[in-house]
Structures are given as C-alpha cells and as structure tokens.
Amino acid sequence: MNIYQTYEPSQIRELIRKKEITGPTAGLAEGYAQANLMIVKKELAFDFLLFCQRNPAACPLLDVLEPGDPVPRKSAPKADIRTDFPKYRIYRKGILQEEVSDISAYWEDDMVAFLIGCSFTFEHALMLNDIPVRHIENGHNVPMYQTNIACKRAGVFHGPMVVSMRPIPAHQITRSVQVTSRFPSVHGGPIHIGDPAMIGIANVDQPDFGETSVIKEGEVPVFWACGVTPQAVVMHTKPEIAITHAPGHMFITDQRDQQLGVL
Amino acid sequence: MNIYQTYEPSQIRELIRKKEITGPTAGLAEGYAQANLMIVKKELAFDFLLFCQRNPAACPLLDVLEPGDPVPRKSAPKADIRTDFPKYRIYRKGILQEEVSDISAYWEDDMVAFLIGCSFTFEHALMLNDIPVRHIENGHNVPMYQTNIACKRAGVFHGPMVVSMRPIPAHQITRSVQVTSRFPSVHGGPIHIGDPAMIGIANVDQPDFGETSVIKEGEVPVFWACGVTPQAVVMHTKPEIAITHAPGHMFITDQRDQQLGVL
C-alpha cells in the first residue's frame, strides 16, 4: 500500500512533472495501464514500428505519437511524454550516456515516440486471482534478463528479447497463463516456463536489470516478454540517438487495465 | 463442400498461380488463414503501418513484407504475393483503374506489401459453434458496407471503416462475440450489433461490396470490421498508386486459423 495508490493518473503525472515523484512507478494509480517508452528519429520510425509489429510480445504498442508531437493523444491526451516519466535514458550510438528527469532539451521536431505496454497491468490481474507477485510482495523492482531469444529483425532493428520473471506456485501456472493471455497489449502469456538456462539465462539470481526475486520451494520461474527489450535492441542497433524510460520508471496512461483485456 | 476444401495452402496457391483457380477463395484450404492485401510505395509505408496500428479491428496485420520483397517470409515463405491472389485491383489516385490476375508487371522495388487478417478464420470458428454463416450456407460473397465510422487518421491515410455483416440468431449473439473475440488478428469481436442505420448503413439489402445476405425472423444483423477498409481509405487518400486484392479473392497463408487465437 502506498499513498499514491488511489490517485488519478493525471495527479500522478503532475507530481512527476514537478519532480515530487522521482522513483519507480509500480503500484501508483492502481488499475491504470503504465507504459514503456522508445523515441527514435523519423527516418527510423518505419523500421521501429515494423519491429514492434513483428515482435508483439516484447513490444506491444499502446500508442504511437505523431512525428514531432509529444502528446499521447490516444492514451493520455493531456500529458507530455517529455516530462511525465520520472526518469529517462539517453542512448547515443547504442551507449547509455545519461539518465535525466526531463527530455525537453533533447526533443526534436523529427522524433517519434512509441508507448509500449507494461506488465504492471497483468500483475494486478494476477493478484486479483490470488497468484503471488514476489517483487511487489517484497517491494523491489522486477528482475529482468537478456535472453538468447532473437527478436525478429525489421530494417535496422534487431537484438535479443528481454524478459521479466515471476516465481509462480506450480499449481497456479495454468491460471497465470490464462490470466495474462487476456492482455496481449501488455505482453500477453508467458514466453517461457521453467528452466532459465533454456532461454540463455545463466543465473536467475543475477538479473541484468531490476532486482532478484526469491524463488521459494514449490515455485517455478515463469518468464514474460518485457518492454525493456527496445533498450537491448538499441544497444545492438546503435542509432545516433534513442531515448527510453529508465526501467521501472514508467508513464501512467489514462487507460484502465481492464480496457486492455481482449475478452 | 468444394473439391479444394482439403487441399494444402501451397497446392491452392499453385492452382491460383496457374490461373486454374480464378474466383473467390472462401472455403478453400479450410482451417488456414486467408489474407487481404494492400501495397503502397515505401514513402507511404510508415503512414500506412501506423494506420493499421491505430485501426487494429479493420486492419489487423498478419504480415508486413520487406520493402521490395514479394515473399511473405512469416506467413507463407514459399509464396509470391504478385501472383498468388486470384484477382487484384490497381488504384491510381484513388480511382480503380483495372482488375488483373497477376501484378508482376506493376511491381516496383520500393513497394511494401501488407497482409491483413480476414474474417474467413472466425467464420470457421462460428460454424464449429453451430452459429450459422448465411453467405456460406447460400454460397455467395459476404455483404460489405461503407459506414459512418471514421477510421483513426495516420499521416495521409484516413477514411471510413468498411464492415461485413452476418445475420445471427438473437440467442447466439453473446456466443458469437465470445468466439470472434478470440481472434483479434482477424478483426476480433463485432463493431456493431443491431440497427444498421446507427453506423450509417441506409439499406442493409444493398451492400457496397459483395452480395446481400437474407436476414431471417429472429436474427439480428451483426457487423465486423472488414479488411476491405484499406480500399475505402485509398479512395479517400488518393495515393499515386495502390494495389489491393479484389474483395473475396484472398491470399491463403500457411498459418492455421487456430494459431491466431489469443486463448
């Protein structure tokens, strides 16, 4: 429980814009969909849009903004994606150059912003089904791993899929597949269930992003495609400039989680 | 029942290529997904891809081919979209100029082909649920209508949604919503249920494309977004050149219908 749990999305965004909220956004404005960010120049926008279309589990699109337009007219028409994430990452030629809390100074008229669905939506649905979500129970960021699963290439964009992991009690795995499959626009059903080595994860206790989740007796690690994938792709593709959110520091949209369910 | 019902997709495509099959493809290679076609020049490809992303009910993408590549490497890697539809339409500046059975002579290195999901997939699922599909029962093309529902604009592309109509017995409407919602990549659940006038259809017995379906006592007209929408959009947007399939004359992919179900 946190004091911001029951705030409206617009209230949270205002606090973020004023830099009164600067940390991870899990649990804020509960019930509203949060989003990952990827910004590229217009000349790469077709390739990246095609990359998302070909890799819908990792990069499910909630909103694609008009070139040069920082306002997400579909998902939060009064917001501004240059100021409404708590933390951003600036990548130049695939290298993380800096983390900032406002990208107004970096924004250019030929940039295109992509908002990508976030697993926080289905975590709420898991908990409503009495399926435990360890990193929320323990109050830390979700563990994320680079895998040996290659994303489908599109134009210049290619790279490995990043996944998030949740330990699920064995008897609840089927239900966790059902619950998350309802939400394809926030990564959908799991990518992998069980042995981490099969998808190239050497040590499940050493995530590449986020923090370790303890796997208890009788639990199985279950892996979902993750919206941090574009950052791994940027590191491989090395565009002149790309701007993303910092993992866990998301954008809160005006769309309710339940509106994203396919049935 | 038709003699081609049990053929493999590759066999049907070969007969189409040899011009031994030249008519509508409904019921051919049953159980395999069929696709609508839209081809635009590379300079418009980002706008059209964004249009599809913003209008997923009307334009659910099964495959987007590389610029200049006529081979659908994801959905039918041994096919050629220039020869494997029975009939194509060539639009210049939004005007239908001609219908041809092969577009090899029109193909250019900077063209991008989009394969869009087709309702034939969910019709099979409806029938497996004992929900009647009138135009299949009566052996004619599905009735399609231009509506007053505006698609969401993307770049230069805008225009009205085209829908297909199936008369459904009132007590089976809920089930028809459930069954078709499983298949968002072939238009998903209905766009409208009931009074045709509410979506701008003046006379349900006079479709804009295809042929009339009789609505029996106790049945309600149910409308689904239709992959002919890009043709209405081309008429509004008037690009120099666009190539589509002729309504009902689809491409047969190697993907099974059931592989497109989200759950």
Curated annotation (Swiss-Prot), chains A, B:
Keywords, alphabetical: Lyase
GO molecular-function term, one example from the UniProt record: lyase activity
Domain of life, per lineage: Bacteria
Cystine crosslinks: none
Coiled coil segments of this chain: none
Enzyme Commission number: 4.2.1.-
Pfam families in UniProt: D-Glu_cyclase
Similarity comment text for this entry: Belongs to the D-glutamate cyclase family.
Protein name per its UniProtKB record: Putative hydro-lyase BPUM_0381
Species annotation: Bacillus pumilus (strain SAFR-032)
